[in-house]
Swiss-Prot record:
Record pathway: Amino-acid biosynthesis; L-tryptophan biosynthesis; L-tryptophan from chorismate: step 2/5
Gene3D superfamilies named in the record: Nucleoside phosphorylase/phosphoribosyltransferase catalytic domain, Transferase, Pyrimidine Nucleoside Phosphorylase, Chain C
Protein name according to UniProt: Anthranilate phosphoribosyltransferase
Binding site for Mg(2+) 2: 229-230
Subunit structure: Homodimer.
Encoding gene, per UniProt annotation: trpD
Catalyses which reaction(s): N-(5-phospho-beta-D-ribosyl)anthranilate + diphosphate = 5-phospho-alpha-D-ribose 1-diphosphate + anthranilate
Comment on bound cofactor: Binds 2 magnesium ions per monomer.
Organism from which the protein derives: Prosthecochloris aestuarii (strain DSM 271 / SK 413)
SUPFAM superfamilies linked: Nucleoside phosphorylase/phosphoribosyltransferase catalytic domain, Nucleoside phosphorylase/phosphoribosyltransferase N-terminal domain
Length: 351
């Protein structure tokens, strides 16, 4: 579709077909449109509201231009959309670490901070993890640990073409929505936290179209009813679940799983060093019970979608055990050691 025809369609608030959106995103990432047109397209799409058919087309375009990596069909990604401005510590990151200690393969796709003070890449780096390993080095690490962090800029180089436009626009765009879906390992199992409950159905419908096997899209509430882009130990958590093509809906509270209810202030994070310290304390057992509960709650959901647990309750038991017997801490220490060793080896080979 030509640039002007596309703009006219979006100005009229008309939805694009999946193929039209795929062509649109491809043109955006390959220099087919001017910067001014790209800014207009992104803003108009955001105003109109992206539909699942459009998002699946955008997903195909983005994955076509991604650097792929083959890991494990059972690997799980835990991530959030951001945007809740709650200032909590990196719950989805420590949840991935705990779940991995419980035997779950993890392929966490992440980036530096966008809407918070500390993104998953930031906190892992502060913990001593080299985040920009090559795909080959990452595959080697994963083969030994069943843990991989996939640094988004490394696997989606075509996004550089629009980075300056997104920065100047200063608004959320379709690329923010795409982020949690665009794992370069093409994972089929995910826990996605969303700050806006109105997009839960969008994600579920798109995950169905992209071949996901088991996913939970979660939206939490604080004690005051404010949004959280993760499961909540402060209030209710709404869940849209996709499992082998079947969609179901649940609303749960922490007490159902034997967890206490906490205040958002109990989960506050800080900068990368602050959040790294919180994660260390969670792993060594010296963190607050609120921090531990929030972490194992999220980790339990990862265990469930991985197939390691048959329900969230069972996942919670596995994650508690992973923390209490020290498996999560020992396992992550080994990951850091091997990450350092592999990074040094590949750096030496390049030099």
């Amino acid at each position: 579709m030509q640039q002007n025809a596309l703009l006219q369609q979006l100005l009229a608030d008309n939805d694009l077909s999946s193929a039209e959106m795929e062509a649109c995103i491809t043109a955006i990432m390959t220099g087919g449109f001017s910067d001014i047109a790209i800014a207009a397209i992104l803003a108009l799409l955001q105003k109109k509201g992206v539909k699942a058919t459009e998002l699946s087309g955008a997903y195909r375009a983005m994955m076509t231009h991604a650097i792929p990596i083959e890991l494990d069909e059972h690997a799980v990604d835990t991530c959030g959309t951001g945007g809740d401005h709650a200032g909590t510590f990196n719950v989805s990151t420590v949840a991935a670490i705990i779940a991995n200690g419980a035997g779950v393969s993890i392929a966490k796709h992440g980036n530096r901070s966008v809407t918070s003070r500390c993104g998953s890449a930031d906190v892992l780096e502060a913990l001593g993890y080299t985040i920009d390993l090559s795909p080959e080095a990452t595959m080697e690490l994963f083969s030994k640990t069943r843990f991989a962090f996939l640094f988004a800029p490394l696997y989606h180089p075509s996004m550089k073409a629009v980075a300056h436009i997104r920065r100047e626009l200063g608004i959320r765009t379709i690329f923010n929505t795409l982020g949690p879906l665009a794992n370069p390992a093409c994972v089929k199992r995910q826990v996605i936290g969303v700050y806006d409950p109105s997009i839960m159905e969008l994600y579920i419908e798109t995950l169905m179209k992209t071949g996901c096997r088991h996913a939970m899209v979660v939206h939490g509430k604080t004690e005051s009813g404010a949004p959280l882009d993760e499961s909540s130990v402060c209030g209710i958590t709404h869940i849209s679940e996709l499992h082998e093509g079947v969609v179901s809906y649940h609303s749960v509270i922490p007490e159902e799983f034997g967890l206490s209810r906490w205040k958002t202030a109990d989960l506050k994070g800080g900068d990368r060093e602050d959040n790294a310290m919180i994660i260390r304390r969670i792993l060594d057992g010296s963190a607050s019970q609120a921090q531990i509960d929030a972490s194992i709650y999220a980790a339990a959901m990862a265990c469930y979608v991985s197939g390691k647990a048959t329900c969230i309750d069972e996942g919670l038991c596995l994650c508690k055990e992973s923390l209490e017997n020290g498996d999560a801490a020992k396992n992550f220490s080994r990951i850091l050691d091997l990450n350092r060793e592999i990074a040094d080896k590949h750096r030496t080979a390049v030099n």
